[in-house]
A protein has these predicted regions:
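Cytosolic ligand/metal-binding cores
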Residues: 52-84, 174, 181-252, 327, ...
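Generic, well-ordered alpha-helical scaffold segments in large soluble proteins
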Residues: 116-120, 151-155, 195, 211, ...
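A residue-level signal for conserved active-site and pocket-lining positions in enzyme catalytic cores
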Residues: 20, 49, 124, 180, ...
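Active-site pocket-lining segments that scaffold enzyme catalytic pockets across diverse folds
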Residues: 91-178, 225, 229, 236, ...
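Conserved hydrophobic core element of enzyme catalytic domains
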Residues: 175, 258-338
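Non-catalytic accessory segments adjacent to catalytic cores
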Residues: 2-128, 132-134
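Short beta-strand scaffold segments in enzyme catalytic cores
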Residues: 47-50, 161-163, 172-173, 178-179, ...
Length: 338
């Protein structure tokens, strides 16, 4: 490992990468539709394609033992090459399955939990807590994750599109939110909180954006996230750069208040150090962190699994990027939970 680090054989994002993530709360009970996903799971992919600027890199990983024959590995590589060069998936010809059922789970309980959380905030037991709810859908045939993935890539080009596949369940989504990125001696994070819809015209879109930039409620919500992330970054950085005012980050249907954060990392601080410190952010958990998690655990009657959790990759140099797993669904055959 030291040899690779010292000689910089691989550009960032290439070579043997670890891909995976963590559950939102490892102390929460596990539900059946998350049975393929442990509290943490990482893997090295067999085939990886990475695009860095205008250059593409193909990485093929294989396990080699001293007694193995060279021919065996050559044959293996040729089989992998055939797989990589196979015909591109044509999502346009796919016919969407028929939606049979759509159920909002625990609506009344969710409303009651909002009232309880509001009471706790008024009593100053917590500054902010974010509660989630579920939507369950069922189709007439198995859901094609390839089709969903292609649609997300096409419709959400400014988001991080991801899929983690298990034996029975698949977690898929398109998140706009970076948790942390490490590049050498520098680390980057994103404060993304406060939102408003996109406009139907360019003028309406501009006016809505300006309204968001001046809205007191959304600015306060955003400042809570900025404050928490700044505190976390200061713990592990020599210096931290944060703009004084947020700007706008626009996706297809919504625009957010956005503040980028950059820091120069102290020695012996790893990417996982930042993940542990930053997760969960106030936008998906609450503030302060230690007070918010037990409240979520008590009020929510379901397992978030890997929803709103850190997902990403790390290379052999210790660089990498993790996002927050939102705008997502866990899919199992004909059913999905959003």
């Amino acid at each position: 490992e030291d040899f690779y680090k010292n000689n910089q054989i691989f550009p960032d994002g290439t070579g043997p990468l670890l891909f995976g993530g963590f559950s939102f709360d490892p102390n929460q009970y596990r539900e059946n539709y998350w049975s393929d996903f442990l509290s943490s799971k990482f893997m090295i992919p067999t085939v990886l394609y990475t695009q860095v600027d205008k250059e593409g890199y193909l990485t093929v990983n294989m396990m080699v033992k001293g007694q193995d024959s060279v021919k065996k590995h050559i044959n293996y590589f040729e089989e992998v090459q055939k797989l990589v060069l196979c015909e591109e998936y044509d999502g346009e010809s796919h016919i969407s399955p028929l939606l049979l059922e759509k159920e909002e789970i625990g609506v009344e309980k969710f409303k009651g939990n909002i009232e309880r959380a509001t009471t706790l905030i008024k009593q100053q037991a917590i500054e902010k807590v974010v509660l989630a709810r579920q939507l369950k859908v069922k189709f007439n045939e198995d859901i094609s994750t390839e089709y969903v993935l292609q649609r997300l890539l096409k419709e959400q080009p400014t988001s991080y599109t991801y899929i983690l596949e298990g034996e029975h369940q698949h977690f898929i989504g398109a998140s706009p939110e970076r948790l942390v990125q490490k590049q050498g001696d520098y680390v980057f994070s994103t404060c993304l909180a406060g939102s408003i819809p996109r406009g139907k015209t360019r003028q309406e879109d501009h006016e809505l954006g300006e309204e968001l930039l001046q809205d007191p409620k959304n600015l306060i919500e955003h400042d809570v996230v900025v404050h928490m992330i700044k505190e976390a970054m200061n713990s592990y950085c020599y210096e931290v750069e944060i703009p004084s005012k947020p700007s706008l980050y626009k996706t297809k249907h919504i625009q957010h208040l956005y503040t980028p954060v950059k820091g120069r990392i102290k020695e012996d601080v790893t990417l996982f150090s930042f993940i542990q410190k930053l997760h969960p952010t106030p936008a998906l958990g609450g503030y302060p962190q230690q007070e918010a998690l037990p409240i979520i655990r008590k009020l929510e009657s379901f397992d978030r699994g890997w929803y709103a959790a850190p997902l990403g990759w790390m290379d052999i140099n210790g660089n990498g990027e993790f996002i927050v797993g939102i705008r997502s669904a866990v899919i199992q055959q004909k059913e999905a939970v959003l």
